[in-house]
Amino acid sequence: NPSNPIVHTFSEGNLRLTGTTTNWDSACSTIGASSGKWYFEMKFLALYGGLRRAAMGLVDARDQSLLMTNEYGYIVTGAVGDCVGYNGNGSSNNIKKNDNNVANGTQWSVNDIICMAADLDNGAVYFRVNDSAWLNSANPESGASKTGAVTITVGEDYVFGGTAYGNTTDWQFNYGAPS
């Protein structure tokens, strides 16, 4: 979102995000939503210092400008809503909500595709790596039961995006959305 401050570089029609080596800053999309089912993919392109330094997720739209100096999954001072992220924070990969570790994720490697399905009607977010099973035994097709999902507040406006630190990520589709 160009109205938010960011130190990263966008290229290739804003589908590629290259991070600086000094900040865990995030980038939010210009698309916000409060309902519906949404699907996103992020291709992880490079390690930084031998570590995974990227994340993807969603944040309450009221908090997006606060998140710009942090990463998805962490809450920042003054935030009022939920922030969920799948973080490649160093040598581990975790699913986080508002600073809390919700589940351990699969460690991704260079060229892996990180996938996120968000069911805003039922308040559920799901993650997977490549075309493998959804993490935490999750099932985006479970609807209102939210099997294995990270739960979020229904009815809020959310924006989607990613975080990069000294590396590059691509945002284009490689796999299909859950049906």
Place the predicted regions along the sequence by residue:
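PRY/SPRY (B30.2) beta-sandwich protein-interaction domains
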Residues: 1-179
